[in-house]
Amino acid sequence: MAFTLTIPRFSAISRKPITCSSSRTQCPAPFTHGRSISLRRRLTLLPLKASTDQSGQVGGEEVDSKILPYCSINKNEKRTIGEMEQEFLQAMQSFYYEGKAIMSNEEFDNLKEELMWEGSSVVMLSSDEQRFLEASMAYVSGNPILSDEEYDKLKMKLKMDGSEIVCEGPRCSLRSKKVYSDLAIDYFKMFLLNVPATVVALGLFFFLDDITGFEITYLLELPEPFSFIFTWFAAVPAIVYLALSLTKLILKDFLILKGPCPNCGTENVSFFGTILSIPNDSNTNNVKCSGCGTEMVYDSGSRLITLPEGGKA
């Protein structure tokens, strides 16, 4: 059965019909003024409740079985990369030095996978670099695992290997009352030093090809795999060897170090080595900062930048 119901709006009577499809529901008419107001309030409250439920459903935390335990959609609970790296190092330190496992193998693998996914360099460190970080954390916590001599020796070894985790910014020493910062190898500029010799080696290679009647070009155009073998196992190694030999003939035992100025932080570069017959036996170079003009001393032995005596920081 269907009934037609007319709902009045306050004192005025609305003429928009509402159909009741329930056969058991009685829709009495006419309504009084008080009943019409009560019914209208109920009708207006229902959509608000539905919208609240929908907003709560949308704002809730999503659940995805593919998300690792260390990656949560909730920003308030998601840990930073630094916190995960610290927990990773603590787990390794506890396992190797204390003989205790603070997490299961599955949790450790999930943490390592998450750090690799985030692009963290901690999980890609060498054994010496991981040992250095563990020793630093253990010293801060009050339980050193290395003596001062072993720690300094390990740090110097990592500096000589070109590790970036031991490079720090400008800082002040309370003991020596000096301001200093660390030096790092500038691999890009050292690579650029080989470019002129490489150009000369390529010129000699094509000159040799020309005077032999393009016999080298004929070998490069041989069918596969002979062309590939000749190119990558004969021609390219010969060019690289010739370029390195020419560079070492002009520059002997060269090293390019870079580091921030202790005064203004501007990065400066210094060259160490012998150019032709001009030797440079000293391990220190006096460098003037290109930013603030501060006089600095670059030490290739300790890989440190210090200010000379009487220098102002």
From Swiss-Prot:
<keyword id="KW-0812">Transmembrane</keyword>
<keyword id="KW-0793">Thylakoid</keyword>
<keyword id="KW-1133">Transmembrane helix</keyword>
<dbReference type="InterPro" id="IPR039987">
    <property type="entry name" value="PGRL1"/>
</dbReference>
<keyword id="KW-0813">Transport</keyword>
<dbReference type="GO" id="GO:0009535">
    <property type="term" value="C:chloroplast thylakoid membrane"/>
</dbReference>
<comment type="similarity">
    <text>Belongs to the PGR5 family.</text>
</comment>
<feature type="topological domain" description="Stromal">
    <location>
        <begin position="247"/>
        <end position="313"/>
    </location>
</feature>
<keyword id="KW-0007">Acetylation</keyword>
<comment type="function">
    <text>Ferredoxin-plastoquinone reductase involved in cyclic electron flow (CEF) around photosystem I. The homodimer is probably not involved in CEF.</text>
</comment>
<keyword id="KW-0249">Electron transport</keyword>
<feature type="topological domain" description="Lumenal, thylakoid">
    <location>
        <begin position="209"/>
        <end position="225"/>
    </location>
</feature>
<keyword id="KW-0934">Plastid</keyword>
<dbReference type="GO" id="GO:0005829">
    <property type="term" value="C:cytosol"/>
</dbReference>
<dbReference type="GO" id="GO:0016730">
    <property type="term" value="F:oxidoreductase activity, acting on iron-sulfur proteins as donors"/>
</dbReference>
<keyword id="KW-0150">Chloroplast</keyword>
<feature type="modified residue" description="N-acetylalanine">
    <location>
        <position position="50"/>
    </location>
</feature>
<protein>
    <recommendedName>
        <fullName>PGR5-like protein 1B, chloroplastic</fullName>
    </recommendedName>
</protein>
<feature type="transit peptide" description="Chloroplast">
    <location>
        <begin position="1"/>
        <end position="49"/>
    </location>
</feature>
<keyword id="KW-0472">Membrane</keyword>
<feature type="transmembrane region" description="Helical; Name=1">
    <location>
        <begin position="188"/>
        <end position="208"/>
    </location>
</feature>
<dbReference type="GO" id="GO:0009773">
    <property type="term" value="P:photosynthetic electron transport in photosystem I"/>
</dbReference>
<feature type="topological domain" description="Stromal">
    <location>
        <begin position="50"/>
        <end position="187"/>
    </location>
</feature>
<comment type="subunit">
    <text>Homodimer and heterodimer with PGR5. Interacts with PGR5, FD2, psaD1, LFNR1 and LFNR2. Also interacts with petC and a Fe-containing cofactor (FCC).</text>
</comment>
<keyword id="KW-1015">Disulfide bond</keyword>
<keyword id="KW-0809">Transit peptide</keyword>
<feature type="disulfide bond" description="In monomeric form">
    <location>
        <begin position="71"/>
        <end position="172"/>
    </location>
</feature>
<feature type="transmembrane region" description="Helical; Name=2">
    <location>
        <begin position="226"/>
        <end position="246"/>
    </location>
</feature>
